[in-house]
A protein has these predicted regions:
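Short, charged recognition helix plus adjacent turn
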Residues: 63-78
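Short, basic-rich loop-to-helix N-cap that marks the start of a DNA-contacting helix
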Residues: 40-53
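Short alpha-helical DNA-recognition segment
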Residues: 15-35
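The alpha-helix within a helix-turn-helix
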Residues: 12, 23, 52
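Residues that mark the N-terminal boundary/hinge immediately upstream of a DNA-recognition element
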Residues: 7, 18, 44-47, 58
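A short, Lys/Arg-rich alpha-helix, primarily the initiator
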Residues: 1-20
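Intrinsically disordered, low-complexity basic tails/linkers immediately adjacent to helix-turn-helix/homeobox/MYB/SANT
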Residues: 55-61
Length: 78
């Protein structure tokens, strides 16, 4: 399961990327911004690209993969 390494919503707030900026710039949709603030990683690659641009980071700086029990079971069946 992919997880954020830190609170990305807070990081966006720190750099001044508000809901208003999301709406007016079109860089991130408001729905995507809501997902990010809820720590939902089910966002598009385009959104991850935008986060990297806004926060001046690489994807590996944003996300980490932690294997769940379900994923372990699925992997064993391969």
């Amino acid at each position: 399961m992919l997880k954020y390494k830190f609170n990305v919503g807070d990081a966006l707030d720190r750099v001044g990327f508000t809901s208003y900026k999301a709406k007016t710039s079109g860089i991130l949709s408001q729905d995507t911004l809501k997902k990010i603030k809820k720590e939902d990683t089910n966002i598009s690659l385009k959104a991850i690209n935008s986060l990297c641009m806004i926060l001046d980071m690489q994807p590996k700086d944003l996300l980490i993969y932690e294997e769940t029990d379900t994923e372990k079971e699925q992997k064993e069946k391969l």
